[in-house]
């Protein structure tokens, strides 16, 4: 609402992951179409030259991971002079991923006159410290949720000596349609993809060691129904 169609960056959104940056950019793009407002996601794993060309063509909102945002700022391909809004999404996730120094470096170079919105599932001390240091008289809005499980989700716990065999029995008897399986580690994802593949299941893995192009290909196959099972780290 307060972003104009002037061809300079007016809002910065920090996200912990490439996937979230892309998702946020897509949603902002839908909203901004009628106002001729462009949003651009920037992240590692994509050629920086392509991002620089898009930035030079003129965008109003940039969404990105802290490391890549900082890279552009140091190259002067992202200029902070006209930033009116800063959004920090999933701040505690960025803290866990070791981005807090990059976040602080970006925040301290922004114009003093701006609005900052910081979203976080938890408020650990380093995040609170950032709010006190770089926000003016911030208001804390806390949402207390008593139900920790979505009401339409049924949960079942299975005790089994062989997880893969137990999973295959579930796939054969109980589960129809698309399925997402979460594993604790990237190695666990790769091993389960191989184990299910040797048993004839159409499964693909998704984790941080894949390039962005590989991730995009996996997601397209899953959405199109060419793969039944998506195995991922969270």
Language-model regions: role of each:
Residues 1-234:
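Conserved helicase RecA-like core
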